[in-house]
Curated annotation (Swiss-Prot):
Compartments, record wording: Cytoplasm
One GO-annotated biological process of the protein: DNA recombination
SUPFAM superfamilies the record matches: Ribonuclease H-like
The protein, known as: Crossover junction endodeoxyribonuclease RuvC
Species of origin: Sinorhizobium fredii (strain NBRC 101917 / NGR234)
Length: 170
Protein backbone atom coordinates (compact mmCIF):
# COMPACT_ATOMS: atom_id res chain seq x y z
CA UNK A 1 0.00 0.00 0.00
CA UNK A 2 1.33 3.42 -0.93
CA UNK A 3 1.27 6.34 1.43
CA UNK A 4 1.13 10.03 0.66
CA UNK A 5 4.43 11.80 1.30
CA UNK A 6 4.48 15.54 1.91
CA UNK A 7 7.67 17.25 0.74
CA UNK A 8 8.92 20.77 1.35
CA UNK A 9 11.33 22.20 -1.19
CA UNK A 10 13.43 25.15 -0.07
CA UNK A 11 15.25 27.65 -2.29
CA UNK A 12 17.60 29.42 0.15
CA UNK A 13 18.44 33.09 -0.05
CA UNK A 14 19.27 35.79 2.49
CA UNK A 15 16.73 38.30 1.16
CA UNK A 16 14.09 35.77 0.09
CA UNK A 17 13.91 32.08 0.85
CA UNK A 18 11.31 30.31 -1.26
CA UNK A 19 9.36 27.33 -0.02
CA UNK A 20 7.03 24.96 -1.80
CA UNK A 21 5.07 22.03 -0.47
CA UNK A 22 3.78 19.15 -2.56
CA UNK A 23 2.35 15.73 -1.88
CA UNK A 24 3.32 12.64 -3.82
CA UNK A 25 1.50 9.33 -4.04
CA UNK A 26 3.07 6.92 -6.49
CA UNK A 27 3.55 8.85 -9.72
CA UNK A 28 1.10 11.63 -8.88
CA UNK A 29 2.02 15.07 -7.60
CA UNK A 30 -0.30 17.46 -5.80
CA UNK A 31 0.35 21.12 -5.02
CA UNK A 32 -0.23 22.04 -1.36
CA UNK A 33 1.22 25.53 -0.85
CA UNK A 34 4.12 27.84 -1.64
CA UNK A 35 5.50 31.15 -0.51
CA UNK A 36 8.51 33.18 0.44
CA UNK A 37 10.12 34.00 3.77
CA UNK A 38 11.91 37.35 3.73
CA UNK A 39 14.45 39.12 5.89
CA UNK A 40 14.81 42.84 6.47
CA UNK A 41 17.89 44.10 4.61
CA UNK A 42 18.25 46.96 7.10
CA UNK A 43 18.92 44.56 9.98
CA UNK A 44 22.21 42.93 10.97
CA UNK A 45 23.06 39.47 9.60
CA UNK A 46 22.23 37.57 12.80
CA UNK A 47 18.78 39.17 12.99
CA UNK A 48 18.12 38.40 9.34
CA UNK A 49 19.06 34.76 9.87
CA UNK A 50 16.69 34.66 12.85
CA UNK A 51 13.90 36.01 10.64
CA UNK A 52 14.53 33.28 8.08
CA UNK A 53 14.67 30.63 10.80
CA UNK A 54 11.45 31.74 12.45
CA UNK A 55 9.60 32.06 9.14
CA UNK A 56 10.66 28.62 7.91
CA UNK A 57 9.96 27.05 11.30
CA UNK A 58 6.42 28.42 11.11
CA UNK A 59 5.94 26.89 7.65
CA UNK A 60 7.32 23.50 8.71
CA UNK A 61 5.20 23.49 11.86
CA UNK A 62 2.08 24.55 9.97
CA UNK A 63 2.32 22.12 7.05
CA UNK A 64 4.04 19.16 8.76
CA UNK A 65 6.06 17.83 5.80
CA UNK A 66 7.60 14.35 5.96
CA UNK A 67 10.75 15.14 3.98
CA UNK A 68 12.71 18.20 2.90
CA UNK A 69 14.85 19.13 -0.08
CA UNK A 70 17.20 22.11 -0.34
CA UNK A 71 18.96 23.46 -3.41
CA UNK A 72 22.74 23.45 -3.28
CA UNK A 73 24.36 26.83 -3.74
CA UNK A 74 26.90 27.78 -6.31
CA UNK A 75 30.04 29.77 -5.64
CA UNK A 76 30.24 33.12 -7.39
CA UNK A 77 32.96 35.74 -7.64
CA UNK A 78 31.69 37.70 -4.63
CA UNK A 79 33.03 35.73 -1.66
CA UNK A 80 31.03 37.76 0.89
CA UNK A 81 27.75 37.15 -0.92
CA UNK A 82 28.58 33.45 -1.23
CA UNK A 83 29.25 33.19 2.51
CA UNK A 84 25.99 34.95 3.37
CA UNK A 85 24.07 32.67 1.02
CA UNK A 86 25.77 29.70 2.68
CA UNK A 87 24.56 30.90 6.07
CA UNK A 88 21.00 31.23 4.77
CA UNK A 89 21.33 27.74 3.32
CA UNK A 90 22.42 26.51 6.75
CA UNK A 91 19.17 27.86 8.18
CA UNK A 92 17.24 26.19 5.33
CA UNK A 93 18.79 22.84 6.28
CA UNK A 94 18.67 23.33 10.05
CA UNK A 95 14.95 24.08 10.37
CA UNK A 96 13.66 20.85 8.81
CA UNK A 97 16.46 18.80 10.39
CA UNK A 98 15.49 20.11 13.85
CA UNK A 99 11.90 19.08 13.08
CA UNK A 100 13.13 15.52 12.52
CA UNK A 101 12.96 15.54 8.73
CA UNK A 102 15.44 13.93 6.40
CA UNK A 103 16.99 16.71 4.30
CA UNK A 104 18.14 15.99 0.75
CA UNK A 105 20.27 18.33 -1.35
CA UNK A 106 20.09 18.87 -5.10
CA UNK A 107 22.25 20.79 -7.54
CA UNK A 108 20.43 23.46 -9.58
CA UNK A 109 21.04 21.51 -12.81
CA UNK A 110 19.50 18.36 -11.30
CA UNK A 111 16.40 20.35 -10.32
CA UNK A 112 16.01 21.77 -13.82
CA UNK A 113 16.54 18.35 -15.39
CA UNK A 114 13.85 16.80 -13.15
CA UNK A 115 11.30 19.47 -14.07
CA UNK A 116 12.03 20.51 -17.67
CA UNK A 117 14.09 17.56 -18.88
CA UNK A 118 17.39 19.39 -19.37
CA UNK A 119 19.94 20.76 -16.93
CA UNK A 120 19.98 24.25 -18.39
CA UNK A 121 16.79 26.20 -18.86
CA UNK A 122 15.04 29.48 -18.29
CA UNK A 123 12.81 30.41 -15.35
CA UNK A 124 9.82 30.65 -17.71
CA UNK A 125 10.30 27.02 -18.75
CA UNK A 126 10.24 25.96 -15.10
CA UNK A 127 7.10 28.01 -14.43
CA UNK A 128 5.36 26.48 -17.44
CA UNK A 129 6.26 22.90 -16.48
CA UNK A 130 5.13 23.46 -12.89
CA UNK A 131 1.70 24.34 -14.26
CA UNK A 132 1.75 21.26 -16.52
CA UNK A 133 2.77 18.92 -13.69
CA UNK A 134 0.48 20.54 -11.10
CA UNK A 135 -2.29 22.59 -12.76
CA UNK A 136 -3.49 23.95 -9.41
CA UNK A 137 -0.04 25.22 -8.43
CA UNK A 138 0.14 28.85 -7.34
CA UNK A 139 3.38 30.69 -6.81
CA UNK A 140 4.32 34.32 -6.56
CA UNK A 141 7.82 34.93 -7.79
CA UNK A 142 10.80 32.88 -8.82
CA UNK A 143 11.78 31.82 -5.30
CA UNK A 144 8.51 29.99 -4.59
CA UNK A 145 8.53 28.46 -8.10
CA UNK A 146 12.10 27.26 -7.65
CA UNK A 147 11.19 25.75 -4.28
CA UNK A 148 8.33 23.80 -5.88
CA UNK A 149 10.76 22.57 -8.54
CA UNK A 150 13.15 21.42 -5.80
CA UNK A 151 10.31 19.49 -4.12
CA UNK A 152 9.41 17.86 -7.46
CA UNK A 153 13.05 16.91 -8.03
CA UNK A 154 13.06 15.19 -4.63
CA UNK A 155 9.79 13.41 -5.38
CA UNK A 156 11.25 12.03 -8.63
CA UNK A 157 14.51 11.00 -6.97
CA UNK A 158 12.84 9.28 -4.01
CA UNK A 159 10.54 7.44 -6.42
CA UNK A 160 13.54 6.19 -8.42
CA UNK A 161 15.22 4.92 -5.24
CA UNK A 162 12.01 3.22 -4.09
CA UNK A 163 11.64 1.51 -7.48
CA UNK A 164 15.24 0.25 -7.39
CA UNK A 165 14.78 -1.10 -3.86
CA UNK A 166 11.56 -2.85 -4.86
CA UNK A 167 13.30 -4.42 -7.87
CA UNK A 168 16.12 -5.69 -5.66
CA UNK A 169 13.68 -7.13 -3.12
CA UNK A 170 11.39 -8.77 -5.61
Amino acid sequence: MQTTIRIIGIDPGLRRTGWGIIETLGNSLRFVASGTVTSDGEMDLASRLCQLHDGLAEVVHGYQPHEAAVEQTFVNKDATATLKLGQARGIAMLVPARAGLRVAEYAPNAVKKAVIGVGHGEKQQIHMMLKVLMPKAEFKGNDAADALAIAICHAHNRQAVTSRLAALAG
